[in-house]
């Protein structure tokens, strides 16, 4: 169950009620939190044992500590502040240095981030949120898989996992962040099956 806790959406108490009901029904919980204002959403995420909290643009040290103590994954979505022209991004460095696991995603949607380009998000993570290329790639792969409770199946190359693999036309991993939004994928495998070099969404 996912709830949006922010100004103009559910407040903290409403979010507690929604996620509490979801937990009683055996659902896992996550939420969109503190995108536009600090409304207690990070604290709610920690209290409710949310597997992840998305956005987190407006954060204080106590919010970061709460996420760390709860083991909640911070899913950072740099395409949204870019699309909205906000001029500020989630405090990735503070989260990482505090020991909060950080994931990275597009937040692709028609209103605030009409981009499907995860490579662009990796670039933004490095240029705007001061993550290293290695941190951004880990955030976009294995940490994102864990944010969906699928880290045991995908997100890294390990025996027993599904062979979801991208081979890049790049001399090293740093070039994934260096080229803004460029598709450097040379070959893509999903579940071990090779796709066309330039594939469409329907082929995936």
Predicted regions and their residues:
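Metal-coordinating catalytic core of metallo-dependent amide/deamination hydrolases
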Residues: 2-39, 108
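Well-ordered beta-strand positions
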Residues: 3, 52-55, 165, 187
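Cofactor-binding loop segments of dinucleotide-utilizing enzymes, especially the Rossmann-like FAD-
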Residues: 6, 79, 191
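Mid-to-C-terminal alpha-helical segments outside catalytic/metal-binding sites
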Residues: 139-143, 150, 158-165, 182-204
């Amino acid at each position: 169950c996912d709830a949006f806790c922010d100004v103009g959406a559910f407040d903290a108490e409403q979010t507690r009620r929604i996620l509490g009901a979801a937990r009683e029904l055996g659902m896992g919980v996550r939420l969109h939190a503190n995108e536009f204002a600090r409304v207690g959403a990070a604290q709610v995420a920690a209290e409710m044992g949310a597997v992840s909290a998305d956005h987190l643009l407006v954060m204080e040290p106590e919010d970061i500590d709460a996420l760390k103590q709860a083991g909640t994954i911070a899913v950072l979505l740099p395409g949204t502040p870019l699309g909205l022209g906000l001029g500020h991004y989630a405090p990735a460095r503070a989260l990482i240095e505090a020991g909060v696991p950080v994931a990275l995603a597009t937040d692709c949607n028609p209103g605030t981030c009409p981009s499907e380009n995860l490579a662009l998000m990796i670039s933004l993570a490095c240029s705007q949120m001061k993550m290293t290329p290695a941190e951004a790639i880990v955030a976009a792969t294995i940490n994102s898989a864990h944010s969906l409770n699928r880290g045991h199946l995908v997100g890294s190359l390990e025996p027993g996992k599904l062979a979801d693999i991208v081979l890049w036309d790049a001399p090293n991993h740093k070039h994934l962040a260096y080229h803004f939004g460029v598709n450097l994928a040379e070959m893509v495998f999903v579940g071990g099956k090779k796709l066309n070099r330039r594939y469409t969404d329907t082929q995936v």
